[in-house]
Amino acid sequence: MAFPTPAQLTEILQPVAAARGLDIEDVKTTRAGKKSQVIIRIDGDERPSSDLIEELSQEISEIFDAQEEAGTLNFGAGYTLEVSTPGVDFPLSASRHWRRNQGRLVGYALAEEPGTTRVARIGALSEDEESVALITMVKKEVRYQIERLENLSRAVVEIEFAQPSAVELEAAMQTFDFAEQNSATRED
């Protein structure tokens, strides 16, 4: 039996994570003799606690061990299992990532301007979760921009060292409908 692929492991892990209200965000495997690694990134609408991650890690380890014993998985001579949350440098590639980071600053590129990085605060998602409100401050004035998620690339949460203004945070917490009614066209 070959070393398991990330897709195979994701299929095994999905029900375990879903039972706890979590999503499998990423699975990476590295086969390196006695130093093989399985790295699993999980997240949820409520950030998982370290206790929950520890419990999940133990359960995953037991599942992998049982499947190795049954001959359905083969990690080779041994492996290191790492279970954690994605971290701030994880790309925002699904609507749930945008929803979970509402109010945070994001660096992103528009599909038609791939070489240009823009920065905005993440607002609400549309009801169908296909568009997001992006908030910028221009001369102390709030500007709403509505973008379809499919038109955004290289989106990553920006680390902030200063507290954003109350006005900007309040704008980020407005409903999508409010943001859409008050949005500027891109030519503004």
Swiss-Prot record:
Primary localization: cytoplasm
SUPFAM superfamilies: YhbC-like, N-terminal domain
Location within or outside the cell: Cytoplasm
A GO BP annotation: translation
Keyword field: Cytoplasm, Ribosome biogenesis
InterPro entries given in the database record: Ribosome_maturation_RimP, RimP_N, RimP_N_sf
Gene Ontology cellular-component terms listed: cytosol
This protein's record includes keyword Cytoplasm: yes
Functional note: Required for maturation of 30S ribosomal subunits.
Similarity annotation: Belongs to the RimP family.
NCBIfam families listed in its UniProt record: PRK00092.2-2 (NF000930)
Protein name: Ribosome maturation factor RimP
Organism, scientific name: Corynebacterium aurimucosum (strain ATCC 700975 / DSM 44827 / CIP 107346 / CN-1) (Corynebacterium nigricans)
